Regions:
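Core beta-strand elements of the Rossmann-like FAD/NAD(P) dinucleotide-binding domain
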Residues: 3-5, 162-171
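Conserved beta-strand-loop-beta-strand element in the redox core of flavoprotein oxidoreductases
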Residues: 127-132, 144-165
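Beta1/beta-strand and adjacent pyrophosphate-binding region of the FAD-binding site
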Residues: 2-15
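Short hydrophobic core segments
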Residues: 10, 166-177
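Conserved N-terminal/central alpha/beta ligand/cofactor-binding core
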Residues: 21-125, 163, 175-195, 199, ...
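Extended, charge-enriched "interface" segments that sit outside catalytic cores
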Residues: 452, 469-638, 642-645
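A glycine-rich dinucleotide-binding beta-alpha-beta segment and adjacent secondary-structure elements
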Residues: 328-394, 422-435, 560-614, 619
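An anion/pyrophosphate-binding glycine-rich loop and adjacent beta-alpha core
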Residues: 38, 206-342, 439-512, 516-524, ...
Length: 646
């Protein structure tokens, strides 16, 4: 049987769901291939969305017209804004979600998306045909040129499934998560699988690799799941959420589900003693697992080996939902034998009678070298083939969702031969993520942090719609309703900012308040904007002194708190924002200098050997991208500039 589509998405995880809905909403006839329709967007590890830098990515997905933020708002059972003690550049929203409801909300989104079909099956073979070779870029006679490996001599035409169905399309997006040749480990026991009790996808990696696309192995893991009825909560510390819930979606609803607390406790020396006794059977330390795991989410056994003098490690017990007794023990990822895990847990006072639903386990899986991709996430080797999510060497639902959105957009554009959509380092964390992947590559699972972004003050969680919604609307991904919401918010912010810039405050109106909060009093009239710039002053306390300010802050019909927050940040940090924007614009000049196809790097002796090798392999699109490749020095960039100017 042959089924014809514009776009085929392989895998129904977070990358696949965002990719499928993005492509379909742009008008492409799309088919999402998944092994289990009842595990759409499964939270395979912790039941939470957002976190440091990750929350910004969710806001960006939403601003582009994606779905993760909307689904999170409908299923959140606890909210926290992380990094509140620091500046707004690094504030990051995070929500615990009801795992089961999260799946069904996503399933509802897919079922109600026009142009989108779901096919329950397993991909086995990538279908590829020869394509006309790309025409080499014209080069100056003074600059050596070479035909690069990035020229696509083949094009994807579809996939074949294990049941013999042939799905044909102009674009195929691979979002297979940890399922490609997945191998799970608990102690010395090894079982093929992509997730606990779910089969691995065999042979599909090889069908891709035979076309010249290289791959390697990575490892990840997940903790034990605990029965809440067996926990002694009196021996734990409660960790409630925050009341001022900030919706992830700019169009999201207010809290729907009842809010649940998390709980904290610590491991004990007795716990550590039992875990150490089982290290000989740990697949991480007996040679069973050779691949690299995530640096920033180590297993409990790795913590013991790395920090042997620590007497305790913090653990966080997180609810999985409102109607289940299953709880997630954050901080206790492990692949130790089952009996070791259970005995170690029972040496923690709060878990002395613990019962578990399933033990922690590790999983090894295939990923593809992301330097083989362009910034659209399309393969440099096979036209129309896109990759997104953990198959690119990343870790995290949010990183996957961001890549899926970009891949879905570009897969749809590829079908019509239209322009490509590229996100940049100064317009989004997604842009930082993709640029890091395709420029630097990965040798361990990649996780996003605010420290990876050089333009953090521009990439705040409060202004993702300002950065991206108009672009998404022009693409046809963001709806008119979403765009109108942004225009309304934009107008409300402008009204507040203009009021503060134009309204004068006299000393007699405000000096008593200023003295009470410990800041300098006024000797003459000043604008409200000048007062807001002071660290002790914010809209909340100042509006209590100035009724006219309170009135304009409350004038917005929707999302008053977030609108006021965005306006306050604009006023407080105006100088920093402008300075960073000027620097970003300077870097854009290098982004506009295209070098792809203009050099035979192997013949440029003035470049270092490492630089020549890296440039030959990665084939950067622009001079700016070349400057970010590890091993390419500023002097190497100057050599290329001299050659370009000849």
């Amino acid at each position: 049987m042959i089924l014809k589509y514009d776009v085929i998405v392989i895998g129904g995880g977070h990358a696949g769901c965002e990719a499928a809905t993005a492509a379909a909403n742009m008008g492409a006839r799309t088919c999402l291939v998944t092994m289990d329709m009842n595990k759409i967007a499964q939270m395979s590890c912790n039941p939470a969305i957002g976190g440091i830098a990750k929350g910004q990515i969710v806001r960006e997905i939403d601003a582009l017209g994606g779905q993760m933020g909307l689904v999170t708002d409908k299923t959140a059972i606890q909210f926290r804004m992380l990094n509140r003690s620091k500046g707004p550049a690094v504030w990051s929203p995070r929500a615990q979600c009801d795992r089961g409801k999260f799946i069904w909300e996503w399933r509802s989104v897919l079922d109600n998306t026009p142009n989108l079909d779901i096919w329950q099956d397993q991909a086995e073979e990538l279908l590829v045909e020869q394509a006309p070779s790309a025409v080499p870029s014209a080069a100056s006679s003074a600059v050596p040129s070479v035909a690069t490996e990035s020229q696509q001599t083949r094009q994807v035409v579809g996939v074949k499934t294990i049941w013999g169905a042939e799905l044909r399309a102009k674009s195929v997006i691979i979002t297979a998560g940890t399922f490609l040749n997945g191998l799970m480990h608990i102690g010395r026991k090894q079982v093929p699988g992509g997730r606990i009790a779910e089969p691995a996808v065999l042979h599909f990696t090889e069908s891709i690799a035979r076309h010249g696309i290289s791959y390697a192995r990575m490892k990840t893991g997940t903790p034990v799941r605990i029965d809440r009825r067996s926990v002694h909560f009196e021996d734990m510390e409660v960790q409630p959420g925050e009341n001022d819930y900030h919706q992830f979606s700019y169009m999201g609803a207010h809290r729907v589900l009842p809010q649940l607390p998390c709980w904290t406790c610590n491991t004990t020396p007795e716990t550590h003693e039992i875990l150490r006794s089982g290290l000989a059977d740990s697949p991480l330390y007996n040679g069973q697992i050779q691949s690299t795991g995530p640096r920033y989410c180590p297993s409990i056994e790795t913590k013991l080996v790395t920090f042997p003098d620590r007497q305790q490690h913090p653990l966080f017990l997180e609810p999985e939902g409102t109607d289940t007794n299953e709880m997630y023990l954050n901080g206790f990822s492990s692949s130790m034998p089952m009996e070791i895990q259970l005995e170690a847990l029972r040496r923690i006072p709060a878990l002395r009678d613990v019962r578990v639903y399933r033990p922690g386990y590790a999983i090894e899986y295939d990923y593809f070298d992301p330097t083989q991709l362009s910034h659209t996430l399309e393969s440099k080797v096979i036209s129309g083939l896109f990759f997104a999510g953990q198959v690119n060497g990343t870790t995290g639902y949010e990183e996957a969702g961001g890549q899926g959105t970009v891949a879905g957009i570009n897969a749809a554009l590829h079908c019509t031969g239209n322009q490509t959509f590229i996100m940049h380092r100064d317009d989004s964390y997604i842009g930082v993520l993709i640029d890091d992947l395709v420029t630097k590559g990965v040798d361990e699972p990649y996780r996003m942090f605010t420290s990876r972004a050089e333009y953090r003050i521009l990439l705040r969680q409060d202004n993702a719609d300002e950065r991206l919604t108009e672009k998404a609307y022009q693409l046809g991904l963001a709806t008119r309703e979403r765009y109108d919401w942004w225009l309304q918010k934009k107008e409300n912010i402008k009204r507040i900012v203009d009021f503060c810039n134009n309204t004068t405050v006299k000393p007699k109106q405000i000096n008593g308040f200023l003295e009470a909060i410990g800041t300098a009093t006024l000797h003459g009239s000043v604008k409200i904007a000048d007062l807001i710039a002071r660290p002790q002053i914010n809209f909340s306390n100042l509006s209590e002194q100035l009724p006219a300010l309170k009135e304009i802050l409350h004038a917005a019909e929707n999302r008053q708190e977030e609108t006021a927050e965005a306006a306050e940040i604009h006023l407080k940090y105006k100088g920093y924002i402008e300075r960073e924007r000027v620097f970003a614009e300077k870097m854009h000049k290098l982004e506009n200098i295209r070098i792809k196809g203009k050099f035979d790097y192997a013949t440029i002796n003035d470049l270092s050997t490492e630089c020549r090798q890296k440039l030959e392999r990665i084939q950067p699109e622009t001079l700016a991208q070349a400057s970010r490749i590890p091993g390419v020095s500023p002097s190497d960039i100057n050599v290329l500039l001299v050659l370009l100017n000849k």
